[in-house]
Amino acid sequence: MAEQKGMDPDTKYIKLQVVGGEVPGATLAQRVGPLGLSSKVVGEDIKKATADYKSLKVHVQLAIKDRKATVEVQPSVATLIIKSLKEPPRDRKKEKNILHNGSLRMTEVVDIARIARSSRSYSNSLSGTVKEVLGTCKSIGCKVDGKCPKEVTREIDAGEIKLPDQ
């Protein structure tokens, strides 16, 4: 695995996609078993760490050092948007490809952009990251301040909406 800045060379990293608030399935045992860890204990740690994202898909990074695993939750922008819409959890097995029809405030979009900027965004500026988040809002189907996210992007480009520098 490629070394990233700030990563310890003695630590093994495993990335998983799990459903928040649930114990991961058999793939966890296959990934952590050879490293000498109990999949049951690690599964419970993941369940506790992802409790805020109940029934949403979320990425988890396990950092394993000296037969101890630390869990870091890395939610995607889409997961953060759905969480801030505060919709009730759905049965993910029955309902697929759901369009979310809620509306976010622009301040919530900026907050999500700040979170995404720290780990996932490739943009040089906060306004670029906000536009990435607005594109995800469009894909999900939600509105921003009651408007289509594409309209809000045009207003940012035209200078009608002022965004903070950082």
Swiss-Prot record:
Top-rank taxon: Eukaryota
GO MF term set: large ribosomal subunit rRNA binding; structural constituent of ribosome
Gene3D superfamilies, sorted: Ribosomal protein L11, C-terminal domain, Ribosomal protein L11/L12, N-terminal domain
Key word Zinc present: no
GO (cellular component) term, any one: cytosolic large ribosomal subunit
Family matches, as PROSITE patterns: RIBOSOMAL_L11
One GO-annotated biological process of the protein: translation
Modified residues (N5-methylarginine): R67
Record-stated family: Belongs to the universal ribosomal protein uL11 family.
Keywords for this protein: Methylation, Ribonucleoprotein, Ribosomal protein, RNA-binding
UniProt-recorded name of the protein: Large ribosomal subunit protein uL11
PANTHER family in the record: 60S RIBOSOMAL PROTEIN L12, LARGE RIBOSOMAL SUBUNIT PROTEIN UL11
